A protein has these predicted regions:
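Cytosolic nucleotide-utilizing catalytic cores of signal-transduction proteins
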Residues: 1-136
Length: 136
């Protein structure tokens, strides 16, 4: 059933290649697998989760990602390459970026701990999301 959601999939297609589509169809093991194999390893690897999330929210624009994170573009390139090694997906590839985007959303929804994003001088988070002040 999940293969209908990705008509361009190579045939035969492996079940693991359809993880996002399986999640959309309500497959709980696929949901856990995406969180465990993509979100958690990126989160455990320092700045990789933040870099990948920012890159995806910047529409895959390397320079914009570097500006948002206050780092050199080569740092972004290195981190994206490293993220691919850690999770097995190359976010510069459209299909892999889709898989990673779904995995990151699932990780946030699953209650996985979130790291704070750096805040720019204008009060915006580096990813472009508004920062909501919290009371202590």
């Amino acid at each position: 059933m999940a293969v209908r959601a990705w008509p361009e999939a190579p045939r035969p297609v492996l079940a693991d290649d359809l993880l996002p589509e399986r999640v959309l169809a309500g497959d709980t093991p696929a949901r856990r697998r995406l969180v465990d194999t993509v979100h958690r390893p990126l989160e455990a690897s320092g700045a990789l989760l933040e870099t990948v999330a920012t890159y995806l929210s910047c529409g895959g624009a390397l320079e914009a990602t570097a500006r948002a994170l206050f780092v050199h573009p080569n740092t972004v390139r290195y981190r994206l390459r490293r993220a691919g090694e850690v999770c097995g997906y190359d976010v510069t590839d459209p299909r892999d970026a889709y898989v990673v985007r779904v995995a990151l959303a699932l990780g946030r929804l699953s209650g996985a701990p979130r790291r704070a994003l750096p805040v720019r001088a204008d009060g915006e988070a580096a990813s472009g999301a508004a920062v909501v002040p919290t009371q202590l």
